[in-house]
């Protein structure tokens, strides 16, 4: 068994869609970034890559590479799943937290779990997503950005994909 930890943060700006866990969420602002800026998916990817000892998303999907401009983070998450598979690793579970003052995320959490599980070809029950605020403190509390934390547990399957 191996464990990995991921963290990401993106700035909230006008004129961008808000995508979290592969779900488009109605809101007056969205996250700024090279890809779709899905802060939750990015934290999950870093946790998985960390568990695999395979670096981070910046190494695999650099923000100066035009191939990733505007790309769906669900496509990148699927590629991370492939990296794990090639190393003979399978996801046991993922636990994550989104830190945002708004919007209210509880209506979207189940769909986030389904989307990320689908990208990784695992069961939604293997993906936990929680949301919290910072009670108005810090950049997230002031509505300047959204952060996400994730922990992933993986295990060796005994079969590395080629």
Swiss-Prot record:
Pfam family of the protein (one)? YgbB
GO BP, one annotated term: terpenoid biosynthetic process
Q: Where is this site: Transition state stabilizer?
A: 34, 133
- Entry keyword annotation includes Lyase: yes
Cofactors demanded by this protein: a divalent metal cation
Note the superkingdom of the native organism.
Answer: Bacteria
The record's function comment reads: Involved in the biosynthesis of isopentenyl diphosphate (IPP) and dimethylallyl diphosphate (DMAPP), two major building blocks of isoprenoid compounds. Catalyzes the conversion of 4-diphosphocytidyl-2-C-methyl-D-erythritol 2-phosphate (CDP-ME2P) to 2-C-methyl-D-erythritol 2,4-cyclodiphosphate (ME-CPP) with a corresponding release of cytidine 5-monophosphate (CMP).
- The protein's name: 2-C-methyl-D-erythritol 2,4-cyclodiphosphate synthase
State the organism named in the record: Pelotomaculum thermopropionicum (strain DSM 13744 / JCM 10971 / SI)
Lineage in the entry? Bacteria, Bacillati, Bacillota, Clostridia, Eubacteriales
**Gene behind this protein:** ispF
